[in-house]
Amino acid sequence: MSKRKTLLIALSVWAFHVQAQKSSIESAFNEKEAISHFRYLASDELMGRDPIRPEMDAASRYISEQFWRYGAVQINGTNSYYQNIPFRLSSPPSKGTVSLGNTAFEQGDGLLVLDGPSLTGKFELVVVGYGQESDYSGKDVKGKIVVTNVGAPNRLSPADLFSAGRDKISLAKTKGAVALIEMYNVPSVPWNLVANYLNRPQLTVDNTNGEESIPYIWLKDLNNEQINAIGKGTITTADVQIQGKINKKIIGKNVVAIIEGTDPKLKNEYVMLSAHYDHVGVGKPNAEGDSIYNGARDNAVGTVAVINAAKYFAKNPPKRSILLCAWTAEEKGLLGSGYFSENPLVPLHQIIFNLNIDNGGYNDTSIVTVIGLGRTSADPLIEKAVADFGLKAISDPSPEQGLYDRSDNVNFARKGIPAPTFSLGFTAFDDEITKYYHQPSDHVESFDLDYALLYWKSYILAAQNIANWTEKPTWKSGDKYEAISKELYGKD
C-alpha cells in the first residue's frame, strides 16, 4: 500500500473519530437544562454572587449538587465537594487619617486602610524598598511603620499588587513593624478607580493563624514625593488615626470534583476545567433602578460550561481524568484559585493542563477568544474543537489589558501548568463589552443563547481533545513559564 493511501486512510479514520466525538456531545447535550443552570446562577435570587453575602452559599450548594447529580465524585480525602477557605472580611474604618509632615491623607481620598486593626499614635517611618526580605537588611523596624513601593518588581498588575501586599504584611509583622504603608505609584491604574473599588469591605485569605494582623495601608504617591522625602529623612514620622476598624472571619468555598479517566496510565493525569462562580454582588443602581449585578457573562456562563462538562464526562470519560473546579472570590483578587494552587487537593504535577473560563463579555458571536492562544502545544486541539462547532478561535486582541495575568489561570501558569482562558468572542474592549462588564445589565435576557450553546459545546470538545491526546501539552519554547513548567514536571 502506498504511503499516500495509508495517510489518506489514517486521516479518514481520524476525521470520523472527531465527527463521532462531536455527535456524542450534540446528542448528550440538554440545551434547556443548560440554559436553566444559566438562568439560576445569574438570577436576582443569588444577589450577584458576592462572596461576602449569604446567597453565595446557595450558589456553591447548587454547583455541588449538579456535580453529585451528574456523577462527578469527591476528591479522595475531602469528604466533600468543597475546599473550605478561611477568609477575613475587613471593613473600612469609621475614621482613617495619616499625616506626613504638613500633608494629611484621609480615608478614600489619598488613603486606603485595606486591612488590620485600629491604630492611633505617632510612629517612626522606615523605607524598605519593595518590602522583600533582602530590603530589610540592616534595618530596624521594630515598633515602626514600614514604608514600601506598592507591588513588586515587574509585578504591577492589579492581582499582583494584592498578592504582593499579602506577602509583605506577614513579613513586616515578623520583623516587628506596627503597620505597613505601601506608596501607590502605578499611573497605569488610576487612583480614583482604585479608591472606588477598595474603599469598601475587603476579603483576604486569613493567614493570621488566630493572631492579630497589622494595619495595611495604601497612600497615593504617584510622583514618589512622599516616599522620597521619607527616604531622605525629610519626613521621619507619621501621625496615624485609624478608628472603628472591624474584621470578621468567614468561610469561602471552592467547589471541586473529579471524573476518573479510562486509560490505566493516563488516568493519573488531570485536565483541570475551571471557572470562577462569584461576581460583584449588589451596587450602584443603573438608570432603571436595578442594583443587582447578575454577572451572566462574568462568569455564570463559564460556571455553566464546567457544569455541562461534568455531566458529559461523567457519562463519557476520556483517557485522562477530569478535575472540575468552580472558584470563589476571583473578583476579590483571584483568592479561591490562589488558595487551591497553594493548597492543592491533587498534586500539581499531575495537573497537565488547565482550560480556564473567565469573561467580560462578547462582541462577535462567530468566534471564541482564547487568552493564551499561541503559547501552548494544545492550540490545534482547541482551534479544531471550536471550528467543529462553526466558530473560530482567535488570540487575545487586547494584550495591553493584561488579561492573561488577571484571571485564575495565572495562579496555575505560575506553577508551570499550561493554562489558557477560553473566553467569549471579543475583538476589542469596546462599548459592547463595557456596557455589560460589571454592570446590572449583565443578565441572561441580554445574552445570545444560541451562541452560548455553541460556546459550551465547543468547550467540552476542546477539553475532550486534550484529555484524549497521546501527548502531554507543553508551553511553547521561550515562554516565560517554560522553565518553571520543566521543574514541575521533571523535564530537562
Task: Show which residues each predicted segment covers.
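Bacterial Sec-dependent N-terminal signal peptides
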Residues: 1-25
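Soluble metallo-hydrolase cores and metallopeptidase-like ectodomains found primarily
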Residues: 22, 104-107, 112-138, 204-295, ...
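Second-shell loop/turn segments in exported
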Residues: 22-28, 44-54, 69, 86, ...
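Catalytic-core environment of secreted peptidases
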Residues: 26-46, 51-74, 138-140, 144-151, ...
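Noncatalytic luminal/extracellular "stalk/propeptide" segments of secretory-pathway proteins
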Residues: 47-145, 152-154
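Extracellular/luminal Protease-associated
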Residues: 107-208, 260, 397
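Metal-dependent peptidase/peptidase-like ectodomains
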Residues: 214-225, 318, 327-431
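His/Asp/Glu-rich mid-to-C-terminal helical/loop segments that flank catalytic regions of hydrolases
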Residues: 311, 315, 430-491
